[in-house]
Swiss-Prot record:
GO terms for cellular component: chloroplast stroma; ribonucleoprotein complex. Keywords: Chloroplast, mRNA processing, mRNA splicing, Plastid, Ribonucleoprotein, RNA-binding, Transit peptide, tRNA-binding. Its main location: plastid. PANTHER family: CHLOROPLASTIC GROUP IIB INTRON SPLICING FACILITATOR CRS2-B, CHLOROPLASTIC (PTHR17224:SF3), PEPTIDYL-TRNA HYDROLASE (PTHR17224). CDD domains: CRS2 (cd02406). Residues 1-49 form a transit peptide. The active site is at H82. The keyword Ion transport does not apply. It is found in: Plastid, Chloroplast stroma. It holds the Pfam family Pept_tRNA_hydro. This is Chloroplastic group IIB intron splicing facilitator CRS2, chloroplastic. It comes from the Eukaryota. NCBIfam families: pth (TIGR00447).
Length: 259
């Protein structure tokens, strides 16, 4: 989702600029930067663990997840295509009874659990293209293993309302996801939930399309997808990338195909 746009000084805070005003720090720098952070009750409320070489050595149910949705802060972006990642976080929080009421590392956080698995729900409050500057320090501070960081974002290559849950992959030209990957040492080993929003019709400008709200028909498809996404995330957290996730992706792929 690359946007070839110049980035003058006056446009540094645009939600769709392509480059961050400062290069994103690598994971090793994030780890060192996390140390001075104030120890709050928030940190004591989530049981965090470092990555282990053998996933079987520690049951998945005791390993926390960092679940982040990408979007732009502010009421004027609410309900736009580029903010469906935020909507997914809100839907998970609602269905799992998690309150989003903590501010840390340029993010709005919710601490809770899915089943008995501790989860950290994250809505970065930097603009979407700088999401990694919020997610990277949080992952380092709470020592969440990379395989348990789920990023949820809008995807133009998928039809509106179609979801895809993957264990790893590239950034697919999505600038927000690319920034997150850069802040996590450019690793492709990053789970992600892609939320289809379709592509711009005709010659419509990509930026205008992303910052546009859904039509009534598209809104119904997205609302259904969000409910299905909550179920998929719950399955992922409780069972990992099992056969259930494979079946979910297959159903999503053909959900709008006529028989």
């Amino acid at each position: 989702m690359s946007l070839a746009v110049a980035t003058p000084a006056s446009a540094r805070l645009s939600p769709l600029t392509t480059s961050s005003p400062e290069p994103c720090r690598r994971r090793r720098l994030l780890l060192s930067a996390a140390a001075p952070l104030r120890r709050t009750r928030l940190r004591r409320r989530i049981a965090v663990v470092a990555s282990v070489p053998d996933p079987a050595a520690r049951p998945a149910e005791y390993t926390p997840w960092l679940i982040a949705g990408l979007g732009n802060p502010g009421s004027k972006y609410h309900g736009t295509r580029h903010n469906v990642g935020f909507e997914m976080v809100d839907r998970i929080a609602r269905d799992e009874g998690i309150t989003m009421n903590t501010i840390q590392s340029k993010s709005l956080l919710g601490i809770g659990s899915i089943g008995e698995v501790p989860v950290l729900l994250v809505k970065p409050q930097s603009y979407i293209n700088y999401s990694g500057e919020a997610i990277g320090p949080l992952a380092a501070y709470y020592q969440v293993p990379l395989r348990h960081i789920l990023v949820m974002y809008d995807e133009m290559s998928l039809p509106n309302g179609v979801l895809r849950l993957q264990r790893k992959g590239g950034h697919g030209r999505h600038n927000g996801l690319q920034n997150v990957m850069e802040c996590l040492d450019s690793s492709r080993e990053l789970p992600r939930l892609s939320i289809g929003i379709g592509s711009p019709p005709g010659k419509m400008d990509t930026r205008a399309f992303l910052l546009q709200k859904f039509s009534s028909e598209e809104r119904l498809q997205i609302d259904t997808a969000l409910e299905q996404g909550v179920d998929a995330v719950r399955t992922l957290v409780l069972k990992g990338f099992s056969g259930s996730i494979e079946r979910f992706n297959l159903v999503q792929k053909y959900k709008f195909h006529s028989v």
